[in-house]
Amino acid sequence: MAERANLVFHNKVIGGTAIKRLISRLIDHFGMAYTSHILDQVKTLGFRQATDTSISLGIDDLLTIPSKGWLVQDAEQQSLILEQHHHYGNVHAVEKLRQSIEIWYATSEYFRQEMNPNFRMTDPFNPVHIMSFSGARGNASQVHQLVGMRGLMSDPQGQMIDLPIQSNLREGLSLTEYIISCYGARKGVVDTAVRTSDAGYLTRRLVEVVQHIVVRRTDCGTIQGISVNTQNGMMPERIWIQTLIGRVLADDIYRGSRCIAVRNQDIGIGLINRFKTLQTQPISIRTPFTCRNTSWICRLCYGQSPTHGHLVELGEAVGIIAGQSIGEPGTQLTLRTFHTGGVFTGGTAEQVRAPYNGKIQFNEDLVHPTRTRHGHPAFLCYIDLYVTIESGDIIHNVTIPPKSFLLVQNNQYVKSEQVIAEIRAGTYTFNLKEKVRKHVYSDLEGEMHWSTDVYHASEFRYSNVHILPKTSHLWILSGKSYRSGSVSFSIRKDQDQMNIHYLSTGERDFCNLLASKKKVRHKLFRFNPSDKKERRISDYSIFNQIISIDHCHFTHPTIFHDTTDLLAKRRRNRLIIPFQFQSIQERDKELMLASSISIEIPINGIFRRNSILAYFDDPQYRTQSSGITKYRTIGINSIFKKEDFLIEYQGVKEFKTKYQIKVDQFFFIPEEVHILPESSSIMVRNNSIVEVDTLITLNIRSRVRGLVRLEKKKKKIELKIFSGDIYFPGEMDKISRHSAVLIPPRTVKKNSKEKKMKNWIYVQWITITKKKYFVLVRPVILYEIADRINLVKLFPQDMFQERDNLELKVINYILSGNGKSIRGISDTSIQLVRTCLVLNWDQDKKFSSIENAHASFVEISIKGLVRYFLRIDLVKSHISYIRKRNNPPGSRFILDNESDRTTINPFFSIDSREKIQQSLSKNHGTIRMLLNRNEKCRSLIILSSSNCFQIRSFNHGKYYNGIKEGINQIQRDAMIPIKNSLGPLGIAPQVAHFDFYRLITHNQISIIKNGQLDKLKETFQVFQYYFLDENERIYKPDLCSNIILNPFYLNWHFLHHNYCEKTFTIMSLGQFICENVCIVQTKNAPHLKSGQILTVQMDSVGIRSANPYLATPGATVHGHYGEILSEGDILVTFIYEKSRSGDITQGLPKVEQVLEVRSIDSISMNLEKRVDTWNGRITKILGIPWGFLIGAELTIAQSRISLVNKIQKVYRSQGVHIHNRHIEIIVRQITSKVLVSEDGMSNVFLPGELIGLLRAERAGRSLEEAICYRVLLLGITKTSLNTQSFISEASFQETARVLSKAALRGRIDWLKGLKENVVLGGMIPVGTGFKRIMNRSKQRQYNKMTSETKKKNLFEGEMRDILFHHREFFFFVSKNLCDTSQQSSI
């Protein structure tokens, strides 16, 4: 009883660590047997108390935190604001991701902190609270998921899923939350994150590497060791104790002259306490790294056994234990993810808050403006920054540490608890960094644009990857893309309007004809005065066609249909061509049909002398078949042959000119041509004669009778059929020199009979072989060309009454060269002759210096009559677009909402407010032509009403740009000139530099009609538009200017000089505007959507919808400027650093990377400078001769320690403690191989051979020569395949290869390891079988050699002192290197 009264009673909570210490002390004092009896009593006591308490767990015991509702709501509100800023283009994707992580992580951590106080207040005896917070079962993370919120989850790659699980397991998960939560769960829907199989395979590889490591000696005799500094705050105490306990000292420990511990003494708790209290010198310990043999290990280098607490016994299989100790926790931790479910773990930066209200002041010279990782503006301070907060008479000083962000401005008033600074988290928490790629995908379909200030140049010439040099916006302009393999949109111009249902509804025949390169078929309809529509599909013979898509001038003409008459009126220095719409009955029969007249205007709108203004393809010069064109001057020759066959003919001689203009007639020799693939089956032979409708291939039949000629060209076969008759002449010499000649209609004498030839023929000599030849007589078509086409046929006679400097000339020319073959495409007709309208002007004194004529378009609508004019001036016009303000009700030109309207005139404009509203709200969009690198594939993009929107709120008060309205209440035309060409809105605008302005005046305009009716005077108001030139300057005209129009006589007068220039802050065409930007200085200012400005009018702005994406420097942009992207395509890729996740499912791959020696982190940019600095300091301190040798030795040791620390960090983050000696055994094996160099030990080892490090050193000592080798880091897999036992290698991987190579080399396996003995069924050399196999004589011989080595290696002892007694210098150098590298990177 007296003894029990002296016992001390501790009324405290005992945790797992305290129980471990108690058990360790019990074993030390009482031994194993008595300790196990004590622990059995503790276990019985615990079970009895749990039974008496009767703890049970029900679903009602899971109590949710009451404040969860408003906390989640607040986090959602913050996320919504963040999403809006991202939508506006203020923050980019990575900043949004980081801030979203911190918002939800902070919310989740608040729940975790509130759990324990909530249980204590509401239900202190709650079973969940008792079991989890006492440590009996469960932990805070698991309870947090039960009653708090699951929070953010990780995917299998360790990336955070940007959708937090707001529910907990008590409330239940939705389907989406359940699937997301299963990413990290065991046996879930998505089980890819579970690394159980990987952990098992890792264990197998580790055991393969170290299965032969057995404790076979007591002491290896090494004098080396690893130095461990005393406890000085740099290393946590717990890790320092774990590093030392169970080790053996490599050297005596002194304090002054007093010896505290001796060499080969094992370190226990008592000795560690003495080291802590006495603060001795650095402690040198023996580790597996210092053992002198790699095939086994001694007791002193291994240390104490972790199970018994004393030195390890001989025959202990420490290699197997080491492999299992590292691999098995990975499996167990992977299984443990069933409870936590792969919850994302991260950290937030520390914040500094203001203590009270006041004005903040700091030195602005010590900070630099920057951007936080959340996208907020801030100041970065590089040194300690002293901040003062003044509040009345109180001055509070705050010191901001370096590399922190200051979130307020100087002299700003701050409120209490307001965040004023953000301190970057400590290096120990965030030192595990990894580079992550974040892809941003396009949210809509459209074309890509960069900001104007972005320099974009790809790294490679044809690469579509661009690196951004600075922060800028990427824009995706909305629009839908239509692509076709060979479509040439010849009648579509950039900015033209068309029906958006055109390509998707019943107009497939048009696209198919274009795709097959057949003749273009236009659907036409005209309007009669009675406003009745007529539709018809015109004949092939009326329309222009596509001859070759390689000639841009002929494939992109503006085509006017047969609803237009081409009329012209010439005046002084001006040519005005009106396009007047008339009915068929009123059409002048003498005028040539203008449907095939194509106006051809340069892109810049400038004509030079002798430029082609228009061209006309006469239908009579068209043919449907392929053939050869011939045109020559005519001469007469005669050749007499034998009596039986006489041919008299009129021969011709070739007249070689590039452009044959003055040809009266030319000849066309037809032939049938087929281009067939090389693999096609041809059913006719070469030089054979076929009849009409003969089967040539499986699906092609001949159309004519004639001779077949086959020719192979570039993996294709060209098949020609020459129509005509065949003659076999008697003598070859008389006719061969006259082959390929044309014969006119003549009388032929044959056998005393005369036969008259009605048509021209073409004689062609065909030679099959030297003895086989014949003459082919082919039919010829003769075309006569008129001398000149009278301009009166093209234009009315009254147009040429006045003389002018401007002239129009009509010139004919043949499209193909002389003797050139013309090939038709399928059923497409071929144009042989083209008539051109050439523009020229007299070179008199006044206009001798004028070389250019400027073209412009004019449109006038008067009471429903719309007239279009192409105007050509020698002096550039300032006004070229005139419209009538309003139209009578009911008058209309073309119904725009007709779905069958497929081709819209490029000059067409909409005439009323109703029509533009229909076009914007229903079916109409705008074409934008796109140029692709692949010329064979063209595409167009259609902007529909869903992609364009109109803002009409400029009706009263001030306008944008500060322009005030002079007269209110004026009804304006609502037309948006989408076809406006003021700015480079398209890649290939047809009229890019035309002046395209509205007329500006408030005065009246008089129009005098001098027609068949009586004279009528009418006045109307002109639109209020402002002039905008290409330099984005606004010109406001004189309000007193008048314009008098006489549209019938075209006696126009333009006032060009009465402009008063005034500059405003304007919105230019093509400018990008982000959402929520105010552009109108009014009270009810509209908040625009983001987009690009298409049109600017006095009362409205047309904006094309677009999405902005903010990109930072170094981001990778995928695609070219103007490229069409589909929805979901990768737009940009960010590369940023993030903290590595603490989840073991992501930690195990890192362990595997270290053990397999794969590169993890990128190499530092200034690595060479750091190595040079290191070598310089080592040489300076230790001396020149031995500097690099000692540096190499330290590098090997330091690399081993670094590998151990990296593996330990992963396991310690999960709360798993593995003794360093287990990891050191593994690391020793993967760092113990060297590669023999080319110039070293050539007489012993082969160059490139892998040998052990100690074996190489022994060979060098025995040979007494320099050792040249390179130390390698081999992965555990390669190490397992490079052992001394080929049986062990063959049982691991590549069995056939290993065994065959061993047989060829004659390798001998000494069966020293465990695995090879197990395979062969022998006794394994560990445990009880160890003493029988061990060779005692070998042991005595080795001990003798060890004692001799100790006497001779005095120099090694001195070097050991240099290496390990200067450990503090090594830490000092490392710290300086780290600091210098951080400063250089900053």
Curated annotation (Swiss-Prot):
It is an enzyme of class 2 (transferase). Disulfide bonds: none annotated. InterPro entries: DNA-dir_RpoC2_beta_pp, RNA_pol_beta''_euk, RNA_pol_Rpb1_3_sf, RNA_pol_Rpb1_4, RNA_pol_Rpb1_5, Rpb1_funnel_sf. Its main location: plastid. Signal peptide: none annotated. GO terms for biological process: DNA-templated transcription. It catalyses: RNA(n) + a ribonucleoside 5'-triphosphate = RNA(n+1) + diphosphate. This is DNA-directed RNA polymerase subunit beta''. The lineage of its organism: Eukaryota, Viridiplantae, Streptophyta, Embryophyta, Tracheophyta. The gene is rpoC2.
